[in-house]
Amino acid sequence: KHSLPDLPYDYGALEPHINAQIMQLHHSKHHAAYVNNLNVTEEKYQEALAKGDVTAQIALQPALKFNGGGHINHSIFWTNLSPNGGGEPKGELLEAIKRDFGSFDKFKEKLTAASVGVQGSGWGWLGFNKERGHLQIAACPNQDPLQGTTGLIPLLGIDVWEHAYYLQYKNVRPDYLKAIWNVINWENVTERYMACKK
């Protein structure tokens, strides 16, 4: 059974950039729903497997992708944020960003543009392409998980579903993007980068 991970900080810890009301709803309602629905879907999937019911297995794929992706994505997202975040990464990650995007500012512009440009709901990502040994920016619709759909290893995810910002930023997604850079946990992103380089 999957369970809702605890946040590594209080709901109000990311204010003024992301308010407590958003964080509480986002974590305790939205993420919790993905976890619950994933558990239900996996149970049904196990039953379908046991019966050899391929039609039922196929019918469950969208729910598995949506709720499984929602759980994976949010579990990364919470750790990608920190009340002590912001600024720039250091060391090897910063060097890789400069190598692959030209500069940290250019990287920020590109990931911001990819995230703002998502039509409807989805995510902007910084991922690691293991085959090429390079960082890449990608956008995924809905809750499609980055690694499961592109093969990139997720390092930093930016949730651009309206539930992530609407109560505070209304329909102005670029303002939310501008704010979120102040709470990016570069230590966590760096740990993820170093782990996938091994």
UniProtKB/Swiss-Prot annotation:
Destroys superoxide anion radicals which are normally produced within the cells and which are toxic to biological systems. This is Superoxide dismutase [Mn], mitochondrial. Binds 1 Mn(2+) ion per subunit. Belongs to the iron/manganese superoxide dismutase family. GO terms for molecular function: manganese ion binding; superoxide dismutase activity. It comes from Pan troglodytes (Chimpanzee). The gene is SOD2. It is found in: Mitochondrion matrix. The modification N6-succinyllysine is found at K44, K51, K98, K106. Its main location: mitochondrion.
